[in-house]
């Protein structure tokens, strides 16, 4: 299933000394809920490697690019025809703008950690709020992706998974897949 529009996440303001867990969860939530990849505007190879490892083990084509320059990343994305959605509690209500965002070909969803630079508000095509209240950036991202894809992301398949989780009423059931590896 190919979800439209394509979505990419830009994580800005990540502080390696204190944000590893939250940023990792931003990446994992993005992957599970249909985003194609994440750009990390900080140098934290450990976080990027952790997200990439999960994507490899659980399938799909999600990527995590480490140490991007956030403003250049946004400008290149916009130059390629993409639109930028900045999640902020000060933006327009998600429910009022999501129909317009769905019409775009591809979107970059910007998720901040600390106070974001003021010029981000100007660079964004959409400044979007989930509830216009302070809360978790992970919950804002999850709700944004769910509204963007109208629940279709919950039925995604993740090809080439090494490990697959099966829905079960009680307990835990997984399948370990053996993939043929090409030898050099």
From Swiss-Prot:
Its EC number is 2.1.1.206. It comes from the Archaea. Specifically catalyzes the AdoMet-dependent 2'-O-ribose methylation of cytidine at position 56 in tRNAs. One of its GO terms (molecular function) is tRNA (cytidine(56)-2'-O)-methyltransferase activity. One of its GO terms (cellular component) is cytoplasm. Keywords: Cytoplasm, Methyltransferase, S-adenosyl-L-methionine, Transferase, tRNA processing. Coiled coil: none annotated. The keyword tRNA processing applies. It is found in: Cytoplasm. S-adenosyl-L-methionine binds at residues 87, 112-116, 130-137. It is an enzyme of class 2 (transferase). It catalyses: cytidine(56) in tRNA + S-adenosyl-L-methionine = 2'-O-methylcytidine(56) in tRNA + S-adenosyl-L-homocysteine + H(+). It comes from Methanocorpusculum labreanum (strain ATCC 43576 / DSM 4855 / Z). The keyword tRNA processing applies. Belongs to the aTrm56 family. Homodimer. This is tRNA (cytidine(56)-2'-O)-methyltransferase.
